[in-house]
A protein has these predicted regions:
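Domain-length cofactor-binding catalytic modules of enzymes
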Residues: 2-23, 32-37, 45-51, 55, ...
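Beta-strand elements of modular eukaryotic interaction domains
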Residues: 28
Length: 386
């Protein structure tokens, strides 16, 4: 159940740092915030605004609150395969997935160039892209990225096979976001706004800057969604080819870094979910833990106090720097025991060790009034960007 920190800030997090609360309070005090900011169970300090926060604004949007990976999110596909139909070793499958889904910072490919060209021909941002940016859009379409982006093969509580994937709008989403954040900061300084944090600078609805940002943001969200779809298609093709059978049953694709116009209590608002997913009644979502723990397929309960939202994952407990200092490759190998993963690159993945994240089971318990669990997944194969 939620805790009211103050009338402008409500939290579902039982495990939350004081710095996280302080950062969220700055956002909640903004005059453009309508009602209260909602903190999800996975909330932690972020760049621009608190990760795991839902920010309702009236007549304005905060580009840094959406963040630099616009449209980052999850996609999960259930197949008509069971655990006993899988080969004894999935190690060859890991190599096959790696060949068709490039990963890593700045990585691109030409595998799906024609599909990328077709998509871009009918989907253009408001900002006129430079030639090198168009090349980036084309080459990074269908690529994973780095950090906590991943592809996983999972089994649910019935031993049914799922493929789960996490990624966003790649380099072009970052570039567009950074450009608009810089414009918002400049306009705020020129207007001599008294902000506690310049990253909370906003665009006012009806201005040219607002219209351009929203158009670019929606385009980047669509790019992220299409990027995940493209990678999922390729991952499924490799899995089904490897097993020799299999058919897709259903697919769930949801953003967790985005803003959209919604009506709550009869009032039209911009609801920004930074590290949160939409959980209106019946909405299906994917909530991952870490690379060695459980993930969940959920249905939203439509809780208005959370602005019909829920967590986007477990949330980091330790920064990447702290995780690297505290844990070794042996620690990571121990926590990934029994799973197929990029063990030969463990030194590049220590900052993603499960112990660097909050307890996903506690996160799910904290939000029992926000979502209903449909399926619990555990990973048997993990491919993560390095």
């Amino acid at each position: 159940m939620p805790t009211t920190i103050n009338p402008k800030l409500i939290s579902w997090a039982s495990d939350i740092e004081p710095d996280t609360i302080r950062q969220a309070e700055k956002t909640a005090r903004l005059p453009i915030v309508e009602g209260h900011v909602a903190l999800m169970p996975d909330a932690h300090v972020g760049l621009g605004a608190t990760v795991g926060s839902v920010i309702p604004t009236r007549g304005a949007v905060i580009p840094a609150a959406v963040g630099v990976d616009i449209g980052r999110g999850m996609i999960a596909t259930e197949l008509d395969l069971r655990a006993d139909q899988l080969p004894d070793s999935l190690q060859p499958l890991l190599g096959r997935i790696e060949r068709v889904i490039p990963a890593g910072m700045g990585q691109g490919h030409d595998h799906v160039a024609r599909k990328a060209d077709r998509w871009f021909a009918t989907n253009r941002p408001a900002t006129e892209l430079e030639t090198k940016q168009v090349t980036k859009v084309r080459k990074q379409f269908g690529t994973l990225g780095s950090g906590n982006h991943f592809v996983e093969v999972c089994l649910d509580e019935r031993d049914h096979v799922w493929v789960v994937l996490h990624s966003g709008s790649r380099g072009i989403g970052n570039q567009l976001a950074q450009m608009h954040i810089a414009i918002a900061r400049r306009l705020s300084r020129e207007a001599m706004e008294d902000l506690e944090d310049i990253d909370l600078a906003s665009f006012v609805q009806g201005t040219p800057e607002f219209e351009r940002y929203v158009a670019d943001m929606l385009w980047a969200q669509d790019y992220a969604l299409a990027n995940r779809e493209q990678m999922m298609d390729r991952a499924l093709r490799e899995l089904i080819g490897f097993v020799g059978s299999g058919r897709e049953l259903r697919r769930i694709n949801c953003h967790h870094n985005f803003t959209q116009r919604e009506v709550h209590g009869g009032v039209e608002l911009w609801i920004t979910r930074k590290g949160a997913i939409k959980a209106a009644s019946g909405d299906l979502g994917v909530i991952p833990g870490s690379m060695g723990t459980r993930s969940y397929i959920v249905a939203g309960l439509g809780n208005e106090a959370s602005w019909t939202s829920c967590s986007h994952g477990a949330g980091r407990r330790l920064s990447r720097t702290k995780a690297k200092k505290l844990f070794s490759t042996d620690d990571l190998a121990e926590q990934m025991s029994g799973k197929v993963w990029l063990a030969d690159r463990a030194s590049k993945l220590v900052d993603e060790i499960p112990s660097a994240y909050k307890d996903i089971d506690q996160v799910m318990a904290d939000q029992a009034d926000l979502v209903e669990v449909q399926h619990t997944l555990h990973q048997i194969l993990n491919y993560k960007g390095t």
